[in-house]
A protein has these predicted regions:
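Buried hydrophobic positions in well-ordered alpha/beta secondary-structure cores of metabolic enzymes
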Residues: 18, 43, 58-61, 87, ...
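Rossmann-like NAD(P)-binding element
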Residues: 6-13, 24-86, 92-97
């Protein structure tokens, strides 16, 4: 497995973060050190120019910005072998637009945080994504222990179109003084049986990501119900 970033030290830092996560599992006796060593040995951190030439599947997880993703794939398109499958981990952006101009089809392969524990993968086909690519990504998802759910291309797909507006509404409730952060989170945990309150979840996801998703939903639909709470812009 190639783990790539725009700087070598960032890629190595990514592997270090993975190693720390596995160390916690070993400490809790949920995984053996031998298995962890084998997993870490299979991960090579580096730059895409050096490591992506022979990949069979590339999953992009760049910042949730259309131009950043388009530029990343345009660069990869010059490096990767023709049969390599391109997949984006975008949480809300158009697969068709991201893939426009590439010499190969693109597919959405949206994992959920934390990816090592969350079972779902949203599989999103763009206008030019062939059935064979969809089937291949579903099969790969199952092989790595995930449950693939195919969704049609639409802003936010399924989970984030439901989840992030809830977080946004919680921010409005805080802004309007209906309750404080602790009260809002406690109400949803105890009253709706959510494992995590919406504002705590927003922090976990990243408020910048929540804002980016709300902006995509609003810009794509023009529906005022997706207007981002001003608190998310602070």
């Amino acid at each position: 497995v190639a783990l790539c970033d725009i700087k070598q030290e960032w890629a190595e830092g990514g592997k270090d973060k993975i190693a720390k996560g596995y160390a916690r599992l070993v400490a809790k006796e949920k995984m053996t050190q031998e298995k962890v060593d084998g997993i870490l040995a299979s991960i090579t951190p580096g730059l895409k120019e050096d490591l992506c030439k022979d990949c069979d599947l590339i999953v992009e997880a760049a910042f949730e910005d259309m131009q950043v993703k388009k530029t990343t794939f345009a660069e990869l398109d010059k490096i990767a072998k023709p049969e390599c499958i391109f997949a984006s981990n975008t949480s809300s952006l158009s697969i068709t637009e991201i893939g426009n101009g590439l010499t190969r089809p693109l597919i959405g392969m949206h994992f959920f945080n934390p990816a090592d524990r969350m079972k779902l993968v949203e599989v999103i086909a763009g206008v030019n994504t062939p059935v064979e690519t969809v089937d291949a990504i579903k099969k790969i998802s199952e092989e790595i222990g995930k449950t693939p759910v195919q969704v049609n291309e639409a802003a936010g797909f399924v989970v984030n179109r439901i989840l992030v507006p809830m977080i946004n509404e919680a921010a409005f409730i805080k802004m309007e003084g209906v309750s404080d952060i602790a009260g809002i989170d406690a109400a949803m945990k105890l009253g709706a049986n959510h494992p995590m309150g919406p504002l705590e979840l927003g922090d976990f996801i990243g408020l910048d990501i929540c804002l980016a998703i709300m902006d995509v939903l609003y810009n794509e639909t023009g529906d005022s119900k997706y207007r981002a709470c001003p608190l998310l812009r602070l």
